[in-house]
Amino acid sequence: MPGLIDAHSHIGGIRRSVLQFDDWGLRATLAYGVTTVFDPSSLSIDMLAYQDLIDAGQVIGPRLYTTSTAMFSYNRLRSLDDARDLVRRYRDFYRTRNVKQYRIGSRRDRQWIAMATRELEVMPTAEGAVDMKLGLTQVLDGFSGNEHAFGVFPLYRDVVELMARSGTSS
């Protein structure tokens, strides 16, 4: 069997500290057969250093991908151009093709992020925050991922069909 992929892994043990070249958490992840992890919102840019160290063989661990830090409301967007600039900075400086907005602001702000990511060929994901209305509007606006459950059970056919037709993961 090829390695497992953890598509929502917050590698907490390697955040906000001096880089460790012998991290037990990364080794344990491999020991359980997980060879690739994706962190949809690392709390620091340390993940970029770990990506490089793993790729260079300096640290033993699974292939590591991340959105880097999430886009928060302090990124005051005033226009679609501001959103393009923000997405471009993430894409170029964090070397990522995935970005996560974490309740960046109004729905208009989220729509600008969705439009900018489409234009710049970056995949947008969003913090669902267990809020049904927020989650559904993010799906309708074009986000490819909703990182947490809707928080409502059961989901009725209209929501299930919306998710299936949109291709949005949750």
Sequence positions of predicted segments:
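Divalent-metal coordination cores built from histidine and acidic residues
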Residues: 3-12, 21-126, 130, 135, ...
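Glycine-rich phosphate-binding active-site loops on the catalytic face of alpha/beta enzymes
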Residues: 148-156
